[in-house]
Amino acid sequence: MKVTKSEIVISAVKPEQYPEGGLPEIALAGRSNVGKSSFINSLINRKNLARTSSKPGKTQTLNFYIINDELHFVDVPGYGFAKVSKSEREAWGRMIETYITTREELKAVVQIVDLRHAPSNDDVQMYEFLKYYGIPVIVIATKADKIPKGKWDKHAKVVRQTLNIDPEDELILFSSETKKGKDEAWGAIKKMINR
């Protein structure tokens, strides 16, 4: 997909702040510092629309980005970050749960994991949570450029088995450095939007 327009619309905390207009939405979820912002920037060919940070837990709101006036990407706060208080984590959890379980415009969630490591318990819980609510998931395994090509299949198998990925859900190996998986990711997103 050729992206000609991309901008942040709103950083929302409550449902009444969500944008109106009925555009399809794709939410992006992942552990803190897994590379969600890099994934967004890489997909839309922008260096810094989604701010990348070396400080995990930076995104604390639902950030809605409009893409080509056709869809919204919704950057969800990173989960599994230990340095925030329990009450903050619970508030994030409620915010994410409210969005995912009530938002009619939500078409799918892109769950981002790190291909170099087996998915964490937080990753597994997130995937199971999405499946419990019947949300389609596209699993993006980032940082593929950090692993020798010959080991991709082995690492992908670990991701698939640890998350127990539903046969209907796609697993795409991705690198924001080399752009590997970018076309496949757009293909999977388009498929979800057109369902």
UniProtKB/Swiss-Prot annotation:
Belongs to the TRAFAC class TrmE-Era-EngA-EngB-Septin-like GTPase superfamily. EngB GTPase family. Residues 22-195 form the EngB-type G domain. InterPro entries: G_ENGB_dom, GTP-bd, GTP-bd_ribosome_bio_YsxC, P-loop_NTPase, Small_GTP-bd. The gene is engB. Mg(2+) binds at S37, T59. One of its GO terms (cellular component) is cytosol. This is Probable GTP-binding protein EngB. One of its GO terms (molecular function) is GTP binding. It comes from Bacillus subtilis (strain 168). GTP binds at residues 30-37, 57-61, 75-78, 142-145, 174-176.
